[in-house]
């Protein structure tokens, strides 16, 4: 039975993301200095984990430049793109590599998006799995009477471990 994977903010081809830091200002968000090395390591890790028939929801910011789109054909899986703020190319550019393009996706009581939902909207869905924030957290507003959290799972490819939600196979 195929597995379902969620990944976000791969930023293939993005030299600047190699300089992103965690909130401590000391630890790099990604271990690579060279974007080509980063891209190759992420492709290798992706294909070691994701099989051709697995479903992958990419939660946005897949590539930073048009040249990096050519990497997509090398990635295993039946891919769906939830568009992010850096996914700026024409739909046809992405349709060559993704079965479906979406603004968001609702699955098993969860909403998948690139940017986090406003906390007042969470009651409708229960769980929002999103990208976009990298090492940052969703701010908490005490007026809502609950704590909202955002955990950093951006580019789990760096540690060669994807987050698998096989239980949600569709």
Task: Describe the residue ranges of each PLM region.
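Receiver (REC) domain switch-region micro-motif
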Residues: 56, 128, 154
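Flexible, gly/pro- and Lys/Arg-enriched active-site loops
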Residues: 94-96, 102-104, 123, 136-151, ...
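Histidine-centered catalytic micro-motifs
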Residues: 10-13, 112, 116, 126-137
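Short aromatic-enriched loop/helix-cap "lid" or pocket-rim segments at secondary-structure transitions
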Residues: 15-20, 124-125, 140-143, 166
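Single conserved hydrophobic/aromatic residue that forms the stacking wall/gate
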Residues: 152-170
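Extended catalytic core of nucleotide-activated donor transferases of GT-like folds
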Residues: 65-67, 89-91, 111-122
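Core catalytic region of metal-dependent phosphoesterases/phosphodiesterases
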Residues: 2-8, 12-106
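Active-site-proximal beta-strand elements of phosphoester/diester hydrolases
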Residues: 3-11, 109-116, 149-151
